[in-house]
């Protein structure tokens, strides 16, 4: 009943809403009123509801109890959540928000106050590839003027991950906040590594700090930095040790600005693989996704490998010019050992340049080259040479001249198209020294193979053997037995 003092007896309310993109919900309130008017009297109620949250393909429900007594509204119990949240390849299982302390809103004209504490709990969060975030809990407290202006503080835990400390404020239009991730061991993030990677995180520490804001017209924006120190990860076929990674970033309007005052920095002490690489450095700065107006630039790439060094001064995306990879003093003996070639052995160093294209209709590498830095040697494996001579009598004499050769000059042209077809054209000049006999050798070698198949099979030595068998010709003999060979004038 309704009197001059307000509503007495049972009081109910039902709220329904629907929005095309966000979804729909229905909320019921049912309780007992006693001389109730807004900010006067008392209305005790329980509430419940349900709905759908379309952007994340989720069903929503809520229930709880509370009261409105004079100018104070109190939520004494609350349980609300989703059956799941799905966004892209991420799936959060059964997230639920409950009260740690009652939420109390004092609607006083001179001294309004909003207080309370909540806990957001979720079961496992899964990602593509089988990686996951363990069951997590975010506990936070509210303190402010009213639901349109309050501050919050809290912390996020996910088993050994965290705590990530949070603080911020809501002013009715914009949510602003900060998150601090204190330094902790890299090993606690093992669940986030997909099992198919077979990667074991062993050492290192990680810490981060992020500031963020969100508003209806602005969307979500964030900026901050993350730091990885002394990281180490082992896999069945390789080890990565001594990783230092610094990531300053901003995110706005769907774009990442990587590197603000300083570029993103990657330093790796050692990569142990079929080829061991050491002292890798690389810097990255720019926008992702990139555009002509806002490019992304990789710079100052350097790594020590195969007794020499590989460098790349700059790679700009979108790409206007090829990025020049320089090879300096690469050991041919270390290279042939790394790819496990048994048919021949080489010694000596080579240098070269590989113009790299990532945005080209035809080429990945075009007009690359290699040359010898000084004297080199080529020695055919005895069993390989003997087998070639036995199987091909006409080529046998030529093969014998190539059993051991000192190379004075070599030049190799390298092309790799975007279908993976690698083309090598080599010109080699040198002296054959076999059984005390010296002869000048001019060898032209051409080879073509899909490099993806080559990486899988590592059959380079077998292919060279087949080419020698089919193309070897007898070198011109320039001297008599036992005498030093000389070029004719």
Model-inferred region functions:
Residues 1-234, 245-255, 259-358, 388-417, ...:
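Extended amphipathic, helix-rich lipid-handling scaffolds
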Residues 181-183, 365-384:
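Short helix-loop boundary/capping segments
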Residues 214, 358, 372, 428-430:
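Short beta-strand segments enriched in hydrophobic/aromatic residues
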Residues 247, 314, 367-372, 416-418, ...:
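Active-site proximal loops enriched in glycine and acidic residues that flank catalytic Cys/His/Asp
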Residues 423-451:
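C-terminal/domain-terminus segments
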